[in-house]
Amino acid sequence: MNRLPSSASALACSAHALNLIEKRTLDHEEMKALNREVIEYFKEHVNPGFLEYRKSVTAGGDYGAVEWQAGGLNTLVDTQGQEFIDCLGGFGIFNVGHRNPVVVSAVQNQLAKQPLHSQELLDPLRAMLAKTLAALTPGKLKYSFFCNSGTESVEAALKLAKAYQSPRGKFTFIATSGAFHGKSLGALSATAKSTFRKPFMPLLPGFRHVPFGNIEAMRTALSECKKTGDDVAAVILEPIQGEGGVILPPPGYLTAVRKLCDEFGALMILDEVQTGMGRTGKMFACEHENVQPDILCLAKALGGGVMPIGATIATEEVFSVLFDNPFLHTTTFGGNPLACAAALATINVLLEQNLPAQAEQKGDMLLDGFRQLAREYPDLVQEARGKGMLMAIEFVDNEIGYNFASEMFRQRVLVAGTLNNAKTIRIEPPLTLTIEQCELVIKAARKALAAMRVSVEEA
């Protein structure tokens, strides 16, 4: 690979990149050159902050491996040929594994026909995916709006709730502390981390936050809003807070929130962007309590780790506010044929291989192992918790969490922290992780903690 000069034209840059894309393998010198290029371009044209983040959680204090390809369903290979077990899962993207052949084949077959829709004619895969989601999702959820990401699915949910509740004089939204719903302006108004919120203040008016898992706080907020005339349009929450640190609410919490929403005439929006698609041992986390939301947000794993897609699914009563003018909320690429092909294949794989049940089985195995390590290393580990294949190890302080991620990197296991809780390392592997790989992950965690204890004692 010849190095591009700093003054290279856009044509030269694109040709250089296409040459790289066509390559199946790289020799040693090409790998070194690519690493240097990627680091330089991140620093000069993407964001140097990403380099410093990776430096803090990779072995040797370097900038980390440069990703080259998937090694299998559950592994990644860097440009140095090192293979890593993926326990990060792209923050919940790879539920059916990396490059799942069923998903890749569906996308390739659709690509051979028509990659994007005309915008004017009816596109069949959007219709088929909407029908499939109506059959898959709980309760009376029936109509789907398609977009490209989780934050877009939340934006659509908020706008849908506003359109439905505004004629009823209800404009307030209640979210929860520790919540993460995205970083676009509406979704950020529901997100609860000051680091992300403060630079963009003031956010949208009418959002309140109450402690997650505290049903009395939720009741009080709904009641006070009613007394002051700030009636609540919707309650939005995650069944399990992912970026908050994999925080599980008390048993019965979702059921109680559903009852409060019914009592006060508020819609219930469940953000299952991270918990959905089999991640917690059920297809959707709300199914653990048989709770049926009015609006459901999906993304991440819906595209099978191959295509980006988000979906906002609602009951007919709520969604009908868009019937008269379906152009009130649209997006150019939402529901495109390639994304819908990926989503349909993903759903098929999840059901055919019963991956939600596998997530429950293998998640229990991993969590048992992590809890045993927490008992062995109480000086380092505060708690291990989770449900299915969404788990977290919380450490006694932030620095230990970063060190653990770095040590796991040495053991060739990828993990990462959560955006709203720096003490917590998230374990979110593909649901296709094998039993043998689960055992290797636990062994790697034990080695990492042992090395960390030695470092602490020597210090």
Curated annotation (Swiss-Prot):
InterPro entries named among the record's database cross-references: Aminotrans_3, Aminotrans_3_PPA_site, Class-III_PLP-dep_AT, Putrescine_aminotransferase, PyrdxlP-dep_Trfase, PyrdxlP-dep_Trfase_major, PyrdxlP-dep_Trfase_small
EC category name: transferase
Pathway(s) it belongs to: Amine and polyamine degradation; putrescine degradation; 4-aminobutanal from putrescine (transaminase route): step 1/1
EC number: 2.6.1.82, 2.6.1.29
Keyword entries, A-Z: Aminotransferase, Pyridoxal phosphate, Transferase
CDD domains: OAT_like
UniProt-listed GO biological process terms: L-lysine catabolic process; putrescine catabolic process
Protein's UniProt keywords contain Transmembrane helix: no
Residue(s) carrying N6-(pyridoxal phosphate)lysine: 300
Cofactors required: pyridoxal 5'-phosphate
Gene3D superfamilies according to UniProt: Aspartate Aminotransferase, domain 1, Type I PLP-dependent aspartate aminotransferase-like (Major domain)
Molecular function per GO: diamine transaminase activity; identical protein binding; putrescine--2-oxoglutarate transaminase activity; pyridoxal phosphate binding
Transferase as UniProt keyword: yes
Binding site for pyridoxal 5'-phosphate: 150-151, 274, 332
The reaction(s) this protein catalyses: an alkane-alpha,omega-diamine + 2-oxoglutarate = an omega-aminoaldehyde + L-glutamate; putrescine + 2-oxoglutarate = 1-pyrroline + L-glutamate + H2O; cadaverine + 2-oxoglutarate = 5-aminopentanal + L-glutamate
Family that this chain belongs to: Belongs to the class-III pyridoxal-phosphate-dependent aminotransferase family. Putrescine aminotransferase subfamily.
HAMAP family: Putres_aminotrans_3 (MF_01276)
Function: Catalyzes the aminotransferase reaction from putrescine to 2-oxoglutarate, leading to glutamate and 4-aminobutanal, which spontaneously cyclizes to form 1-pyrroline. This is the first step in one of two pathways for putrescine degradation, where putrescine is converted into 4-aminobutanoate (gamma-aminobutyrate or GABA) via 4-aminobutanal. Also functions as a cadaverine transaminase in a a L-lysine degradation pathway to succinate that proceeds via cadaverine, glutarate and L-2-hydroxyglutarate.
Protein's recorded name: Putrescine aminotransferase
